[in-house]
Curated annotation (Swiss-Prot):
Catalysis: reaction(s): uridine(34) in tRNA + AH2 + O2 = 5-hydroxyuridine(34) in tRNA + A + H2O
One protein family per Pfam: Rhodanese
Top-level division of the source organism's lineage: Bacteria
GO biological process, one term: tRNA modification
Annotated NCBIfam families: PRK00142.1-4 (NF001136)
Annotated organism of origin: Bartonella quintana (strain Toulouse)
Stretches of the chain forming a coiled coil according to its record: none
Top-rank EC class of the record's enzyme: oxidoreductase
Protein name (Swiss-Prot/TrEMBL): tRNA uridine(34) hydroxylase
Amino acid sequence: MEKNFKVAALYCFADLKHYRQLQKPLLDLCQAKDIKGTLLLAQEGINGTIAGSCRAIEELVNFIKTEPAFQTPEIKYSWASKMPFHRMKVRLKKEIVTMGVEGINPLKIVGTYVDPEDWNALIQDEETLLIDTRNDYEYAIGSFQGAIDPGIKTFREFPEWVRKHEADLKKKKKMAMFCTGGIRCEKSTAYVRELGYEQVYHLKGGILKYLETIPKEESLWWGECFVFDERVSVKHGLEECGRELCRACRSPLNAEGKLSPHYEAGVSCDACYNKRSEVDRERFRERHRQIQLSKLRAMHSHQE
């Protein structure tokens, strides 16, 4: 399968008081180069995932690096067979990854970074408690062997989970955390360090860097890694897995899930069918019809 689109997942924490001034030039460049995706700007830095041609992504990354605060962004590259985003957004936010706890600053205090090559040894240590900081639907399709699933719906719930399980968390000497690309662990490890935990570690570059770097035969990862774009999930070597999203609840679906009697394209799946009313489903059906009509109109306009 030909992979025409380069995908860049990037973030950089910085003290960026003038972040509002960067919104327009970033959006203008992305639109001029036909780059799509989302970039978040806040006083604490930049975060996002974008996709485009190889040259366009290189130009954007070089432009970002011209900002003195963004000299060394954390970037993971991968490829997609089709454009994994529908539009380009550059948003101004309070946080570039939302934890909702005031005063957490990874520039001041953070866990110890562990390279993918050293990760297996750390998480196989009997004194290490391994925590998946992602959401429950991400954990459901893949994680590291032996990892604890906090069962959270959003990252905002993570601090409360830590506080509830503080007694259990202190039973092991070391705490190791991981997430998709590394940014959530910047905040989660900073948070637990502020609580007084000392031996706190996190996977540098996140799961994506591990799957890119570590051969499958040496890997302690099971399943797939959920990604927040139209690829839905990737596996070792950052290859696409062929999943789709339920457009009603955004749960990842494989071929088997689409055979369920509860599955209806754009309307429902096993994960959300019993959580929605028939009124909800009719609303989703109408939305799905409008989306399909919009696609048809776009296709006809290109043919004229």
